[in-house]
Amino acid sequence: MVNDTISDMLTRIRNANMAKNDLVLIPFTHINLEICQILLKEGFIQSFKTLTLDVSKYSKLNAQKNLNIVVKLKYLGRQKNSCITNLLRISKPGNRIYAKHKIPDMLGGLGIIIVSTSAGIMTDREAREQKIGGELLCSVW
């Protein structure tokens, strides 16, 4: 069992990018789903969809369904240059990082910071426009 699902998601995407895989399977949580929506809106991934795997065929103990998110990564050109250069976890379970409404730019506006606010999970630009702060989850560039 994974304690930090956001770090697990970022690591899976980072590893799939380095291996130049087209698809990556991520465990379903609502936070992971919202982060995928932001990455799609900002153009870092091509698409994503939720997938239900029926585990009852393989396990006689429990008839349970396993929810996952399948992310299709985005590459440019013949050499498959990734749209995602790096993914960094900012706020960790042992060290939470919060910011007021004056969130700094990421690489002069080239990257984004994903922020968890009282109005939901959003990018740093949206949080600055709405003048609300929150927990800095991760940065993507």
UniProtKB/Swiss-Prot annotation:
Belongs to the universal ribosomal protein uS8 family. One of its GO terms (cellular component) is ribosome. One of its GO terms (molecular function) is rRNA binding. Pfam families: Ribosomal_S8. Keywords: Chloroplast, Plastid, Ribonucleoprotein, Ribosomal protein, RNA-binding, rRNA-binding. PANTHER family: 40S RIBOSOMAL PROTEIN S15A. One of the primary rRNA binding proteins, it binds directly to 16S rRNA central domain where it helps coordinate assembly of the platform of the 30S subunit. It comes from Pleurastrum terricola (Filamentous green alga). Part of the 30S ribosomal subunit. It is found in: Plastid, Chloroplast. GO terms for biological process: translation. This is Small ribosomal subunit protein uS8c.
